[in-house]
């Protein structure tokens, strides 16, 4: 029996985590976000109604679930208020279902200004951030000058700390980036206007999770972005600013690391990436266009067209190692319907001619890397909405089996459409 289940992306994000978290929370009492910020974009489709969440955990739509934003998440008060209002306008009582860690760093207007000023200054070498202030907020946290949710309990001290940190950042904005200064009074007024709402949701998350563990409650930890965007283990510097791997669960929520029972890796049946950075299996031909169109590969947060390519099992094996994956959930299998053949990257050819089956680390080391493919027959039959494994074409079953063989991890869940009902649960993580 797995009480603490982690759901995370095994690629570069956009694997379809939100739907799976929402589906599995039928049995959960708590859903916890432990890293990232409102740069995430989790799309849920329930009874045909689409909901996109960026900051609030995907369990918020269920009345039996308490959603928690852990200390590893950088929290934008304005983004949270906007998201809360959208949900409350639809009759969802967010304030009754959402709790926050007081250790969450705040994202304020000057973080956004810095993020955008830096990307502009980088020009052609831009990282491709979402421009939401995520990186600068994490920088402030590590530099120990960041303001946190808990600082809002003492409004007078908060105002003093804010003045100090804004003088520092405005100096950089004006003198180095030649950008406009951010108005201190506006930031203070905007934050004070929502301070009481934020502090009313504060709880000791680590203690709450430990009590839940002792009671035997089911807890779901919801990852954002994907393994290959991890600040330490991803394609640095083309990465996000947090630990997207399973190790981030303990540090970003306060759960003891030995208490993680099952790690579910969400695996898209092909590969996508947003923004700059290495992508060995990227396709620039009509197949790449087909995957983009069929998969509706446009970012939920930015609306940017995603880069598309074949599934890279070399990179996925790295995700298996980093996360000690228990099982996969394979998503978007239906996007491959109609292709005459499908390919799996099984190794890389390095610039010096060597064949390797492990990924390079730094982005520069990926230069000149060529994918080595295994080609399999495709299938013409539709897999969309199929709810039983026996209803899948043999060629699709062969593709699934080969992924399991190449990665050494079982596919426990298969998703065949965006709705939560269009799913085959072969092994429930909470029963594993």
UniProtKB/Swiss-Prot annotation:
Please give the NCBIfam families that the UniProt record associates with this protein. Answer: PRK01117.1, purA
> Family, per the entry?
Belongs to the adenylosuccinate synthetase family.
Q: Name one GO molecular function term.
A: magnesium ion binding
Native organism: Salmonella typhimurium (strain LT2 / SGSC1412 / ATCC 700720)
The residues responsible for catalysis, as annotated, are 14, 42
Protein name, UniProt field? Adenylosuccinate synthetase
Which SUPFAM superfamilies does the entry mention? Answer: P-loop containing nucleoside triphosphate hydrolases (SSF52540)
Query: Per its UniProt record, what CDD domains does this chain match?
Result: AdSS
- Supply one GO BP term: 'de novo' AMP biosynthetic process
Chief location category: cytoplasm
User: Which positions in this protein are listed as binding substrate?
Assistant: 300-306
Where in or outside the cell it occurs: the entry states:
Cytoplasm
Give the protein's biological function.
Plays an important role in the de novo pathway of purine nucleotide biosynthesis. Catalyzes the first committed step in the biosynthesis of AMP from IMP.
Residues recorded as binding Mg(2+), renumbered to this chain, are 14, 41
Name the pathway it acts in: Purine metabolism; AMP biosynthesis via de novo pathway; AMP from IMP: step 1/2
One Pfam family it belongs to: Adenylsucc_synt
Its EC number is 6.3.4.4
Instruction: Provide this UniProt record's keywords sorted from A to Z.
Output: Cytoplasm, GTP-binding, Ligase, Magnesium, Metal-binding, Nucleotide-binding, Purine biosynthesis
What is said about its interaction partners and assembly?
A: Homodimer.
Q: Which PROSITE patterns match?
A: ADENYLOSUCCIN_SYN_1, ADENYLOSUCCIN_SYN_2
What cofactor does this one take? Mg(2+)
Which gene name does the record give? purA
